[in-house]
A protein has these predicted regions:
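Chalcogenol-based redox active-site neighborhoods
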Residues: 1-155
Length: 155
């Protein structure tokens, strides 16, 4: 069973595309956290295009997202090296987290039959409570959907 809106966000520690270790609870009482789960980088088909389209829509509003005292992470089962390559290739301004053991992916997004994270986004308030869960993702408008969700949070 995966986490839902209203649940306390479960802590995890994952390595980022920048080589830094990210501990979710380290942001508690400091920042909202957006966790964007997606299946995998560089798939040879539609999912790869969806990853890029989703990244583009988030990048378009990223300055507005971080202005809401928020940090955003994208998470997949890819290795740190793959994440770093993907971030560099597409000039993505936010950190991608590597979850090859599927620790956060299983708790939050759940995994599909291939063992990849299901595409979903979690908005965690500064208090550590999950404020919104998006499972039906429109990749071209997802950045604005994230921003709209953040703007509803009362700090």
């Amino acid at each position: 069973m995966t986490l839902e809106k209203g649940n306390i966000a479960e802590n995890f520690e994952l390595l980022g595309s920048d080589g830094q270790s990210i501990i979710l609870n380290s942001y508690k009482n400091l920042k909202n956290v957006v966790l964007c789960f997606y299946p995998k980088n560089h798939l040879f088909a539609c999912p790869s295009k969806k990853v890029f389209e989703m990244a583009k829509s988030v990048i378009a509003v990223y300055p507005d997202i971080i202005s809401t005292t928020t940090v955003l992470f994208a998470i997949s089962v890819d290795s740190v090296d793959s994440q770093a390559e993907f971030v560099k290739e597409y000039e993505i301004p936010y950190v991608h987290l590597s979850d090859p053991k599927k620790i956060a992916c299983k708790k939050y997004a759940g995994t599909n039959i291939a063992g990849l994270a299901k595409r979903s986004t979690f908005v965690v308030g500064m208090d550590g409570v999950i404020r919104d869960v998006m499972r039906e993702i429109n990749v071209t408008s997802h950045g604005q959907e994230i921003l709209d969700s953040l703007n509803k949070i009362k700090v």
